[in-house]
Amino acid sequence: MSKNVAEYFACDVFNDEVMKARLPKAVYKALTKTRKLGVPLDPTYADVVANALKDWAIEHGATHYTHWFQPMTGSTAEKHDSFITPTDNGMVIMNFSGKELVKGEPDASSFPSGGLRATSSARGYTAWDPTSFCFVKEGSLYIPTAFVSYTGETLDKKTPLLRSMDVLSEQSIRILRLFGNTTATKVTSTVGP
């Protein structure tokens, strides 16, 4: 007998409902501001978010996390790391910091750059995109990220999309102000019905 989709849809997604239940009120509010307005998240709050995310992911069967991004190759890429840290007494502890959540450093030499950088300057960084929800799949916590070179050039398909959404919002707010709307703070563009 099959389950109703509504019973399990998004059950492995660290969505707004889960965040609200698991994060302290001040941290939830700060993260919501980051997600909706682009306000930088305080690094101490990033540690709290990372800890809640790790605990939730472990409860959903995750032992690893990955910074997940879409390089210019037309596919997806992942850099996996483990929550597991061995201890001196033969046990393990599960660790995940705000620094590990916010930024990763994969080798970018195998990804096309459109001639933006020399191969010797192949270091690239992933940066957490808090506007997309994290999720658990096959024992790994997937952290949606943007991917840029060490000098800031775009190496993925997501970064230009995020930048264009910001510009579109900014210009839409200008138009709304011309029409007398003084309360809107952001315009969100979507695709589809």
Indicate residue ranges for each PLM-predicted region.
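Glycine-rich, acidic/polar active-site loops that bind/position phosphate-bearing ligands
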Residues: 122-193
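Histidine/acidic residue-rich metal-binding segments in metalloenzymes
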Residues: 4-98, 102-120
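Flexible glycine-/small-residue-enriched beta->alpha junction loops
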Residues: 1-10, 134-137, 141
